[in-house]
Amino acid sequence: MINVRNTSRRALLAGVSASVFTGACASFFQTGDDTGNSELRRETLRTMKRAARFMRERVAYRGGYVWSYAADFSRRWGEMEAYPTMIWMQPPGTATVGHLYLDCFHATRDEFYYQAAMDVAEGLIAAQHPAGGWNYLHDFAGEESTRRWYETIGKSGWRLEEFHHYYGNATFDDAGTSEASQFLLRLYLERRSSRLREPLERAVRFVLDSQYENGGWPQRFPRVDGEVEYAPYITFNDAVADENIKFLLMVYHTLGDERALAAIRKAMEIFPATQQPAPQAGWSLQHHHETLAPMGARTYEPLSLATHTTAGNIAQMMDFYQWTGERRFIERVPEALAWLDGLRLRDDQVQVQGRQYPTFIELETNRARINHRRGSNSGSGEYYWNYDVRRPITHYSQWRALNVDALRERYNRLASENRDALLARSPLNAQANFRLPRFFTTDTIDVSDLNSTVGAGTTERPTGERVMELNSSLNAEGYWPTPLTATSNPYAGEPPAAASEGDFAQTLVGDRFDTSPYVTQTPVTGISTAAFIQNMSSLLLSVDSGE
C-alpha cells in the first residue's frame, strides 16, 4: 500500500515560507548546461506534445487512466486487471496524470495541457461519489458492471482483500481521494472555473463530514450495511490522517476556508488520544472509532501495535508541536522512542537486511506477530499469524527499516527550540500571497504499481544527454515502450474447494485462479502510465521557463 507525497508538500506541513514553492527550476536550455540549444528545446516540446496527445486521445477513457496497457489494448491493469470502461484512482492513476498535465502547463504555458487537465477533471467528476470522495476505481459501464468485476476479478485477488467486496462508498485508502481532491483544488485555483467549484466543495465536505468528533477518520465513508468490520475504524495506515491534513492545509491557505483549520486542529487531538500507555507507548494501524482501542484489519493485519505507524505518528506529533508550540504533543515522544528501542533486533535476529524492527507487536507481551498463509487462492487459502519467523508472507513486509535515531535527534532539537520562533513559522497562520507548488509530479510519490519506479525519488533536472535519449525513445505511435513486469492471471472462474498443488506461502500470486498481480520473468512490452509520468516529469523540468 502506499504513502503519497513528501518533499515540497511535506514542506508545506512544516510551515516553510511560501517563497519556497514559487521558485522555479531553471532549464538547462537557459543556463547553457550540456547541449541546451533552442532546437533541442523545440524537439523536446514536440516529444512532450506527441506523448501527451497519444495518452489523451488513444489511451484515456472519458478522461481517466489505469496504470498499464497491453500494446494492442487487449488487457489493462490498475492495481488489478481492469475492464476497458474503468479508470483507476490510486496513484499513479487518473489524478496523477492530471497533476502531470497541469505541471506541463506551468512549464510550457501551452493551452493544450490545461485542456488535457480539464479532461482529467471531467473524468474525476464523473467518478466522484455523491458524498464527495472516490473509490479505488470507477467503471463507466455502471453499477452492474462494477459489481460483476468485484464478484469475479476483485474477489479472486487472494492478497488484495480490499477488493473482495463492493460497498458503493468511497475510501481514504491509498491516497486516491486525497490526490483527486488536491488535483481539483490546483486546477480550480488556476482559473477559478465554475465547472470545478462544486466538485471541489464536495471533496472538501467529504473530508469534513467523515471526520469523527474525536478527530480521526475512517477508512471508508459513508457507512453502509454489511461492510467489513474495520471500515469505520480510525485509520492511521497509509497516512490517511496525514493526507487529509495536507489537503485541508491547502484548502485553508488557498481558499481561506476556516472549516479546514478547525478540522486540522481537531485531527491533531486523535494522535495523543490513541497513543498507548507505557511501556508500549505506540499506535496501531487503526483504532476503534469509539473506544480508541487498537484493532486489527485485513487478515494479515492482526490486532497489534505497528512499529512503522508508531514512527510515522511520532513524526506527526513533532509536526504538531512545531505548529502549535504545545508541549503536550511531544511530552510522550520519549516513551514511544524507548518502546521502539526495545524492539530493535540484534544483528543475528535480522531476517531481511536493513529491516531491524518487526512490523506487528503483540499487546502486553511485546512479541512479534508474523503473518503466513496456506492454500492456493482466495477460495482455498487463508492467512494466519504466529511467532515463527520462518517462511513469512512476502507481499506485506513483516519487518521495517526505521530511523529512530533521526526521530530522537529531531525531538531533542525541537525540545530546545524557542516556542515563539516555532509559532512564527506555523502553517496554521494565514499566509499572504500563498501559492501551491508549481509542480507536483516531480516530488516523491510512493505507488503500488509493480511496473514502476516512478516517484522513488524527487525527479531531477535531466542532462542534455538524457533529454535526447527520451526524445529518441518515444516510438512512432507516441509512447515510450515499457516492459510490463507486472501481470496477472486472467479470471478463470470460481476456484475449486481443494487447494492446488504447489507452495504459495511466499509468492505474490497463488494458482491460476488467483488474480493478484505478480512480477513476471517474461514481460511483454506495453504502455505504462507511470513511465509516461516519469519521463514527462523529466522533460518538463528541462523546458521549464520558470514563469
List each language-model region with its residue ranges.
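Well-ordered alpha-helical scaffold segments within catalytic/enzyme domains
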Residues: G32-R41, A95-E111, E179-S194, E243-D257, ...
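Extended ligand-binding groove/face enriched in aromatic
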Residues: V59-L102, T108-K246, L261, Q275-S304, ...
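Extended, well-ordered alpha-helical scaffold segments
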Residues: L40-M55, R109-I125, R192-L208, G256-P272, ...
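N-terminal secretory signal peptides
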Residues: M1-T22
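Active-site/pore-lining binding-face segments in mid-to-C-terminal subdomains
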Residues: M318-Q431
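A compositional/structural signature marking long, glycine- and acidic/polar-rich segments
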Residues: Y230, R265-R328, V333-D341, L345
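Low-complexity, Ser/Thr/Pro/Gly-enriched N-terminal "stalk/linker" regions
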Residues: F29-P92, D119, G123, A127-L160, ...
